[in-house]
Amino acid sequence: MGKKGKVGKSRRDKFYHLAKETGYRSRSAFKLIQLNRRFQFLQKARALLDLCAAPGGWLQVAAKFMPVSSLIVGVDLVPIKPLPNVVTLQQDITTERCRQALRKELKTWKVDVVLNDGAPNVGASWVHDAYSQAHLTLMALRLACDFLARGGSFITKVFRSRDYQPLLWIFQQLFRRVQATKPQASRHESAEIFVVCQGFLAPDKVDSKFFDPKFAFKEVEVQAKTVTELVTKKKPKAEGYAEGDLTLYHRTSVTDFLRAANPVDFLSKASEIMVDDEELAQHPATTEDIRVCCQDIRVLGRKELRSLLNWRTKLRRYVAKKLKEQAKALDISLSSGEEDEGDEEDSTAGTTKQPSKEEEEEEEEEQLNQTLAEMKAQEVAELKRKKKKLLREQRKQRERVELKMDLPGVSIADEGETGMFSLSTIRGHQLLEEVTQGDMSAADTFLSDLPRDDIYVSDVEDDGDDTSLDSDLDPEELAGVRGHQGLRDQKRMRLTEVQDDKEEEEEENPLLVPLEEKAVLQEEQANLWFSKGSFAGIEDDADEALEISQAQLLFENRRKGRQQQQKQQLPQTPPSCLKTEIMSPLYQDEAPKGTEASSGTEAATGLEGEEKDGISDSDSSTSSEEEESWEPLRGKKRSRGPKSDDDGFEIVPIEDPAKHRILDPEGLALGAVIASSKKAKRDLIDNSFNRYTFNEDEGELPEWFVQEEKQHRIRQLPVGKKEVEHYRKRWREINARPIKKVAEAKARKKRRMLKRLEQTRKKAEAVVNTVDISEREKVAQLRSLYKKAGLGKEKRHVTYVVAKKGVGRKVRRPAGVRGHFKVVDSRMKKDQRAQQRKEQKKKHKRK
């Protein structure tokens, strides 16, 4: 049985995600955006009526693209969530009550645009759903005819069905232009199309049958025509030959061909062209191919006919040039004074001037035709150029839409530290004089939208946070950061100096006036500083004093308890042994650190002072012998257990407090076995005595021997792999958790990013609402805002590969490494760290 796919997720295309990102309530908003981009009906509209408007995506688009003071009304069966500057009604568009509510809301107004994106509840048969949608469209058209102004537009959704053509015919009776289109945002598998009707005729009276679905969608039966009706009764007029033309073969001369007004018509009637003029026959243009073509014109093709027309043009130019030369020669002969010859030449010139004038007229006509042809060619080239430009703009627009650059609501980030139109960029009177024009109301609006409660203490703290963030996120440099915690205190001490410098800079600007007094501003800055997360764990002074007193009391109780314990052990240990124990460097080295070590030392010294009087000088030899017996014990570990000297006294060292030991997964598994069963614990202890155990110190055996023994002489633990893997998995989960400093650093980074994003959003809204600049400038400014706020493209992930010796400069891609990688070595790392240290020193010197 086949598995049914998820229908809902497949419908979440790019327009669905774009609607989520840009804040539109439905993906159908992009359909209206694309329709308006093509037909431009929202920019000029002052009143709009949206039928079946829920959930309000088309109302959002209309409010964005229409003028600010426009009237927008939305109607639907279900309630619509309120929108700014939009009136919503919950009515049924097929009832008279809805018409009355609209009249009450619009009063005497006529709307310029009526939108209809309604569709009935589908689920029945396709024929029934299509008819219901066509009926709903007809009702929407009825409301549009009641409230639409002359020349208005009606945009509606229609399903492709058998009722589509009747609807289209009704639209054409009421509007000048009716166009059907399918925007890109409409799904290809959907049967919906959008009809844009422009130029409402506003007739004085509309026939009510137009809005009656029984009449509008009535099927017209076309009567079938009979065979006799299909046969034409009128006899066509007989077409014969021209009057007086008794032959089909027409022979003409080349002179007639040159004098013909329409050479194409001449060639269609001629059968042969005779080259009877010897001078024209000897012309270079009269080739052998031309002679052959002139013999039988009826069999020529397009190429040969074009060659004959070109041949005619060349001969006409040759004849015109020859006639001009003859005319000039006649003028010269007339000016020579030979009257007799002049009379004769006049007669000849009279006969030749007439053809020369005719040739000039023909030449002028030819030049005129050539000029017209050139003008047509220029017009065609201009149209092609405009078409290419339009196609290029459309392609760029599609690319911008695909890249989410030309969508409403998409804002990028900051252009500067103080905003786009802030007065802090003007320093001095010289720059003030340059600002001669500007929209001061827009600037005041922008400044009023800026947050006044956000106070920045200093940029030094932000730099310090960035440094600590980098160190927190880099585990290798955690130790270095802990050693340089004093730098933060120094930066905080310099905070007041930096703020004083900033106040001096602000006082230099004559255009900026502080809104609050200096004392109030300093108090707010101090409160903001101590409200940071780093001071959240600090309590009041009273709680701190109480905590310190409790710690001191606990310390005194522990010291007294240790002194009493030493006094109880004192009778079991001779004074000489106690003295030796106190003076021995072995126990001084092995004493625990911290408060316990100090308390133990103080207790021992106190006991030594009390027993000092009871020790006589006669015991000096005994003490010297005891010191000699203690010499072999110096430098050895206390873990070897208690030792006995020659006199038989047992020396009991001070026991170390139990050290906290972190168990590995095998140790945790063994601990679980020990804690769960006494028998398993007993067996485990018995099995610990085996031939694999040895008690030699690490220094007594060679290192290679110890390594080999660890590898080959290991007894298997009495725990299963599943238990060990369980604790190993728990360790991995614990290690995967970030430490507290890393978590705090990430939280600080996220908080700063959100704050930066909020500031960027406000500045971007101010840029979008500015009327004085073009859309292209707005996009450029928004892009720069994104770039400066660091909200643009993410940084490319680079994989670092450690270079090996002897490989050379060219390194192939290692196995398992994808994307961009960089080859590094230890020398490069040291050089980079040295460079960073130098830069840090330079920064400290500047401060």
UniProtKB/Swiss-Prot annotation:
Interacts with NIP7. One of its GO terms (molecular function) is RNA binding. Keywords: Citrullination, Coiled coil, Isopeptide bond, Methyltransferase, Nucleus, Phosphoprotein, Ribosome biogenesis, rRNA processing, S-adenosyl-L-methionine, Transferase, Ubl conjugation. The modification Citrulline is found at residues 392, 783. InterPro entries: RNA_methyltr_RlmE, RNA_MeTrfase_FtsJ_dom, rRNA-MeTfrase_E, rRNA_MeTfrase_SPB1-like_C, rRNA_MeTfrase_Spb1_DUF3381, SAM-dependent_MTases_sf, SPB1-like. The modification Phosphoserine is found at residues 333, 335-336, 347, 356, 549, 584, 644, 676, 688. This is pre-rRNA 2'-O-ribose RNA methyltransferase FTSJ3.
